Amino acid sequence: MRDNLRQYRAIRDALTHGYPGEPTGRLAQHLATLAAFISGIVASKSTQLPKVASHVPGGTKPESRVKRLARWVDNDPITAAVSFCPSAQVLLAPLALQTLVLVLDGSVVGRGGVALMIHVVYKGRALPLAWLVRQGKKGHVPEALHIAVIEQVQRQIPAGAQVVLLGDGEFDGTTLQQTIQDYHWSYVVRTGSHITVRWDGETFRCETVASCITPGTLVELTDVRVTQEAYGPVMLLCCWAKG
């Protein structure tokens, strides 16, 4: 438990740096619980409350610690803006000295839910920066929510930082691409083979390019317009990896 206490204090002190002054009162209590939560998750390698609580330092009974964590999770005033964003900004400040690589991803959570998340890549790990959760299936999240979660992260990015956003095929909406362009970010997203492509005076489907390549081939088309709206110009890459 001594190691858990040392870890908890280190996490609490690091979280405190995200605030302009020393947190007091209710905010300090919430921050202490957040630090305990993070410390317990790291030590237990689990997000189940009983396992997390068993690694939270303190003289209270495990049942009391579980209730404390559960109350914190269910507390409506505990929002990402209050408890998470300050820490994310502290994390991003040193990382932004180099190009920030962000990953946009959708994951199934709970029963019938989907979480839309943006992570920053750091030493081979994806660290979450922002998320939205809704009922639905993966791949069926409206583009407006893609943009909403992008906007959450954009407010945390240090001014002047170079950003590259990576996304799967569900994130190729042209309104989302324009939003990313407006932020002066670079981006790479997959797209479907059915997408309409306009290049060099010709109009064809993306799968036409794919049918012309062989294993180990990379085709690069520049000054491309995509979809019926002719969004662009963008670069289109079509690759058939070996193996």
Per-region residue spans from a language model:
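Single, function-defining residue in the core of a domain
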Residues: 1-46, 84-85, 95-100, 111-113, ...
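Nucleic-acid-interacting cores, centered on viral/eukaryotic replication and modification enzymes
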Residues: 119
